[in-house]
Swiss-Prot record:
<feature type="coiled-coil region">
    <location>
        <begin position="182"/>
        <end position="503"/>
    </location>
</feature>
<comment type="similarity">
    <text>Belongs to the WEB family.</text>
</comment>
<feature type="region of interest" description="Disordered">
    <location>
        <begin position="650"/>
        <end position="674"/>
    </location>
</feature>
<feature type="compositionally biased region" description="Basic and acidic residues">
    <location>
        <begin position="694"/>
        <end position="718"/>
    </location>
</feature>
<dbReference type="Pfam" id="PF05701">
    <property type="entry name" value="WEMBL"/>
</dbReference>
<feature type="region of interest" description="Disordered">
    <location>
        <begin position="694"/>
        <end position="759"/>
    </location>
</feature>
<feature type="coiled-coil region">
    <location>
        <begin position="657"/>
        <end position="715"/>
    </location>
</feature>
<feature type="compositionally biased region" description="Polar residues">
    <location>
        <begin position="79"/>
        <end position="88"/>
    </location>
</feature>
<feature type="modified residue" description="Phosphoserine">
    <location>
        <position position="139"/>
    </location>
</feature>
<feature type="compositionally biased region" description="Polar residues">
    <location>
        <begin position="741"/>
        <end position="753"/>
    </location>
</feature>
<keyword id="KW-0175">Coiled coil</keyword>
<feature type="coiled-coil region">
    <location>
        <begin position="532"/>
        <end position="587"/>
    </location>
</feature>
<protein>
    <recommendedName>
        <fullName>Protein WEAK CHLOROPLAST MOVEMENT UNDER BLUE LIGHT-like 1</fullName>
    </recommendedName>
</protein>
<feature type="compositionally biased region" description="Basic and acidic residues">
    <location>
        <begin position="662"/>
        <end position="674"/>
    </location>
</feature>
<feature type="region of interest" description="Disordered">
    <location>
        <begin position="1"/>
        <end position="119"/>
    </location>
</feature>
<keyword id="KW-0597">Phosphoprotein</keyword>
<dbReference type="InterPro" id="IPR008545">
    <property type="entry name" value="Web"/>
</dbReference>
C-alpha cells in the first residue's frame, strides 16, 4: 500500500466520437480534499499494473512516444501550481504538485520498485487516461469531490502504439496508390475517348440508315397513295360495270319479254316490253344528259380554278421579282453599312491609339514630374541643412567677436594699469626697466597674438558673411527655381486636366460610337434576318410555283379525264341510241314480217276454206290461230344465242371487275404490310439511334469530366509554377532594389559626377556643390 496525496487533479482531454485523441492536455482543477488518506483503507487495495516497465533512464517512463518527470522535476513544479500546461501527445507531460511514497516491498525486473495503479506515472500516461473507454464520461478527479479509487479499475489501455503514420492511415483505410489511380483515370479516359470515336463513327451510318428508312417510308407512302388511286379508279370501273350489268340485265329481260310477247302474238302498240324499253331508254338518256351537265359544271369550275391558279402564279412571280429587287437593295444597304462599320472601327481604333498615346504621355509626364519634385525636395533639404550649418557658424563667429571685445577691453585695462604703474613707479624705473621691458615684450607678443586672432576672426567673419550672402543668393535662386517648378507643375496639371477632359470627350465619343456600332449591329442582324426570310421565301416561291403548276397539271389531267368520261358517256349514249334505233328498226321489220306472214296466212286460210267447202267437209287439222306467230327455228336460235351471249358478256364483265377488286385489295394488304414493316424498322432504328445518342452524351459527359479534371490539374500546376516564378522574381526584385540603393548611396556620397547637367535648369547645383566642397576643404 502507498499513500496518494494530491492537491491538484488531472482533467481528461477532449476525445473524438471514434475514440481517438484530439488534444491531450493537463489542467489544474479544484483541489481534492485530503480525506483520500482516511478513506484509503475503506476502499481496499489497488491492483498494480504489471504491464508498465521503467526505462531506468533519468527517472522517466517512455510510453506511446511520451515520458514523465522524475521526483525532482515533480517537486520543481510546486513553485507554480496555478499555471496550466497543454501537452501534445509527442511532448513531455509534467504533473503538477504530486507527492508520492514508494514501498520497498519488491522490485521489478528492471530493478525499479513497482508502481501502483494510480501513481503519477500511470496517471500521466496518455494511453491510461485517454482510453476510448473514457470517451463518454468526464474525469472523476475534475469535480473536486472525494471519489473511490475502485472506479478507475480496468481502464488502462496497454495496446501498442502506432509505429508510423502509414500504419495509422492504412488502418483506417486512407492509403491509396495515386499512380495506379492516375493510370486507371488515364485508361478510363482513353476508353471513353475510344467509345466516343466509335459512336461518332456510327452516327453517320445511323443517319444514313435513318435517311434510307425515311426514303423507303416516302416510297411506301407514294405506293400507298398510288394504290389508293388505283382502288378508287377500280371502284369507279366496278360501279360502271355494275351499272352496265344492270342495264344488260334489263335489256335481256326486256328482250325476253318482247320475245314472249312476240310468241304470244301481242301487237307493238299493246306490248309492255316495248313501252318499258322506251322508258328505260328515256331514263338513260335523261341520266346521261344530267351527267353531261354535271361534267360541264365541273369542267367550268376546273377552268375557273385554273384561271385563279394562273393569276396566283402571275402574282407569285411578281412578288418574287419584287422580293429579288428588295433583297438586292438590302444587300446594297448591308454593303454600305459594312463599309460604314469598317470606317467607324478604323476611327475607333485611331481614337483608341491616340487615347493610349495620350495616356502614355501623361504617365511619362507624371513620372518625370515626380522625379523632378523628388530631386528638388532632396536639394532643398540639403540647402536647408547647409543653412543650419551656416547659422551655427555665424553663432560661433558672434561668440568669437564677443570674446575679442572682451580681450580688447582687458587689453585697455592692462594698458591703463601699465600707465598707472609707470606713473607710480617712476622712482623705481631703473630697477624695474628690465621688468618693464619683459612685460612690454610679453604684452607686445600678446597684442600681436590678439591682433592676429582678431585679423583671422575678421577674415573668418568676412568669409562667413560672404558664404551667408552666397547661401542667401543660392536660396533665392532655389526659391526662384521652386517657383518656376511650381509654375511648370501648374502647367502640367492644367495639361493633365485638359488631357482628362479630352479623355472624357474621347470616352463619350467612344461610348457614342459603341452605341452606334450596337445600333448598326442590330440593324445588320435585322437585315440579315430579313434576308434569311426573303431567301426562305425565295426558296419557298419555286416550291409554291411547282405546287401550283402541279395542281394546275392535276386539274388539267382531271379535266381531261372528265372530258374523256364525258366523251365515253356520249359515245355510250350514242351507242345506246344506235342500239335503240336498231332495235326499233328490227322490231319494225319483225312487225312487218309478222303482218306479211299474217296476210299470207289469211290468204292461205281463205284458200283452204274454199278448198274445204269445195271438197268434202273434211276437217282442217293444221289450222293456225290468228293470234299465233310462227318463227323459223333459225330465228329462234339466233335470238336465244344473242340473249345468251349478252348474259355471258355481262357475267364476264362482272367477274373481271370482281377479280380487279380482289387484286386491288391484295395490293392494298401488301402495301399495308410493307408500311407496318417500315414502321417497325423505323421504331427499331429510332431506338438504336436513341441508344447511340445516349452513349454519345455519356461519352461527352465523361470527356467533359476528364477535361475538367485536366483543367484543374493544369490550374494547380500553373499556380505552383507562378508561385515559384513570383518567388524568384521577388528575390530578383529585392536584389535589384539593393543594387539601386547602393548606387543611390554612392551617388549621395560622391556628388561630383552629377556636375555634368542634362538640362539647363540644373546649372545652379554645381555651384552649390562646389561651395560645399570648398567649405569642407576649408574646415
Amino acid at each position: 500500500m502507498e499513500d496518494l496525496k494530491t492537491t491538484d487533479a488531472l482533467s481528461l482531454p477532449v476525445v473524438s466520437d471514434n475514440g481517438g485523441i484530439i488534444e491531450p492536455e493537463l489542467q489544474l482543477p479544484q483541489a481534492i480534499p485530503t480525506e483520500l488518506e482516511n478513506n484509503e483503507e475503506e476502499n481496499g487495495t489497488i491492483q498494480q499494473s504489471q504491464s508498465e516497465e521503467d526505462s531506468a533512464e533519468n527517472g522517466k517512463i517512455y510510453m506511446d512516444d511520451t515520458f514523465l518527470p522524475s521526483k525532482s522535476q515533480v517537486k520543481e513544479t510546486q513553485d507554480s501550481p496555478t499555471t496550466p500546461s497543454f501537452v501534445s501527445p509527442s511532448a513531455e507531460i509534467v504533473l503538477p504538485r504530486v507527492n508520492t511514497k514508494y514501498e520497498a516491498e519488491g522490485t521489478t525486473r528492471n530493478a525499479v520498485s513497482p508502481r501502483p495503479l494510480y501513481s503519477p506515472r500511470s496517471i500521466g500516461s496518455p494511453r491510461a487516461l485517454l482510453s476510448p473507454r473514457f470517451a463518454g464520461s468526464s474525469s472523476p478527479l475534475s469535480n473536486g469531490t472525494p471519489i473511490s479509487m475502485d472506479s478507475f479499475r480496468d481502464s488502462i489501455d496497454t495496446a501498442s502504439p502506432f509505429e508510423s503514420v502509414k500504419e495509422a492511415v492504412s488502418k483506417f483505410g486512407g492509403i491509396t496508390d495515386w499512380k495506379a489511380h492516375r493510370m486507371k483515370v488515364l485508361e478510363r479516359r482513353n476508353f471513353v475517348e475510344q467509345e466516343l470515336d466509335k459512336i461518332q463513327e456510327e452516327i453517320p451510318e445511323y443517319k444514313k440508315k435513318s435517311e434510307m428508312v425515311e426514303m423507303s417510308k416516302m416510297l411506301a407512302v407514294e405506293e400507298l397513295e398510288s394504290t389508293k388511286r388505283l382502288i378508287e379508279e377500280l371502284k369507279l370501273n366496278l360501279e360502271k360495270a355494275e351499272t352496265e350489268e344492270q342495264q344488260a340485265k334489263q335489256d335481256s329481260e326486256l328482250a325476253k319479254l318482247r320475245v314472249q310477247e312476240m310468241e304470244q302474238g301481242i301487237a307493238d302498240e299493246a306490248s309492255v316490253a316495248s313501252k318499258a324499253q322506251l322508258e328505260v331508254a328515256q331514263a338513260r338518256h335523261t341520266s346521261a344528259i344530267s351527267e353531261l351537265e354535271s361534267v360541264k359544271e365541273e369542267l367550268q369550275t376546273l377552268q375557273n380554278e385554273y384561271d385563279a391558279l394562273v393569276k396566283e402564279k402571275d402574282l407569285a412571280v411578281k412578288e418574287a421579282e419584287e422580293a429579288v429587287i428588295a433583297s438586292k437593295e438590302v444587300e446594297r444597304k448591308v454593303e454600305e453599312l459594312t463599309i460604314e462599320l469598317i470606317a467607324t472601327k478604323e476611327s475607333l481604333e485611331c481614337a483608341h491609339s491616340s487615347h493610349l498615346e495620350a495616356e502614355e504621355h501623361r504617365i511619362g509626364a507624371a513620372m518625370l514630374r515626380d522625379q523632378e519634385t523628388h530631386r528638388w525636395e532632396k536639394e532643398l533639404k540639403q540647402a536647408e541643412e547647409e543653412l543650419q550649418r551656416l547659422k551655427q557658424h555665424l553663432v560661433s563667429t558672434k561668440e568669437l567677436q564677443v570674446k575679442l571685445e572682451f580681450a580688447s577691453a582687458l587689453l585697455l585695462d592692462l594698458k591703463k594699469e601699465l600707465a598707472d604703474h609707470k606713473e607710480s613707479s617712476k622712482v623705481k624705473e631703473e630697477t624695474s626697466e628690465t621688468v618693464v621691458t619683459n612685460i612690454e615684450i610679453s604684452l607686445q607678443e600678446k597684442t600681436t597674438d590678439i591682433q592676429k586672432a582678431v585679423a583671422s576672426a575678421k577674415k573668418e567673419l568676412e568669409e562667413v558673411n560672404a558664404n551667408v550672402e552666397k547661401a542667401t543668393s543660392e536660396v533665392n535662386c532655389l526659391k526662384v527655381a521652386s517657383s518656376s517648378l511650381r509654375l511648370e507643375i501648374d502647367k502640367e496639371k492644367s495639361a493633365l486636366d485638359s488631357l482628362k477632359q479630352r479623355e472624357g470627350m474621347a470616352s463619350v465619343t467612344v461610348a457614342s460610337l459603341e452605341a452606334e456600332i450596337d445600333i448598326t449591329r442590330c440593324e445588320i442582324a435585322l437585315v440579315k434576318s430579313k434576308e434569311k426570310e426573303t431567301r426562305e421565301e425565295m426558296v419557298e416561291l419555286p416550291k409554291q410555283l411547282q405546287q401550283a403548276s402541279q395542281e394546275a397539271d392535276e386539274a388539267k389531267s382531271f379535266a381531261e379525264l372528265a372530258r374523256e368520261e364525258l366523251r365515253k358517256s356520249q359515245e355510250e349514249a350514242e351507242q345506246a341510241k344506235a342500239g335503240a334505233s336498231t332495235m326499233e328498226s328490227r322490231l319494225f321489220a319483225a312487225q312487218k314480217e309478222i303482218e306479211a306472214i299474217k296476210a299470207s296466212e289469211r290468204l292461205a286460210l281463205a284458200a283452204i276454206k274454199a278448198l274445204q267447202e269445195s271438197e268434202s267437209s273434211s276437217k282442217e287439222n293444221a289450222v293456225d290461230s290468228p293470234r299465233t306467230v310462227t318463227l323459223t327455228i333459225e330465228e329462234y336460235y339466233e335470238l336465244s344465242k344473242r340473249a345468251h351471249e349478252a348474259e355471258e358478256a355481262a357475267n364476264a364483265r362482272v367477274a373481271a371487275a370482281v377479280s380487279e377488286v380482289g387484286e386491288a385489295k391484295e395490293t392494298e394488304k401488301r402495301s399495308l404490310e410493307k408500311l407496318e414493316e417500315v414502321n417497325k424498322e423505323m421504331v427499331e432504328r429510332k431506338a438504336t439511334l436513341a441508344g447511340a445518342m445516349e452513349k454519345a452524351e455519356k461519352a461527352k459527359e465523361g470527356k467533359l469530366g476528364v477535361e475538367q479534371e485536366l483543367r484543374k490539374w493544369r490550374e494547380v500546376s500553373e499556380k505552383k509554377r507562378k508561385n515559384g516564378s513570383s518567388h524568384g522574381k521577388s528575390i530578383q526584385g529585392s536584389k535589384e532594389k539593393e543594387a539601386e540603393t547602393s548606387v543611390s548611396n554612392e551617388t549621395e556620397t560622391n556628388p561630383i559626377p552629377q556636375v555634368n547637367p542634362v538640362k539647363k535648369k540644373k546649372k545652379l547645383f554645381p555651384r552649390f556643390f562646389m561651395f560645399l566642397m570648398k567649405k569642407k576643404s576649408h574646415k
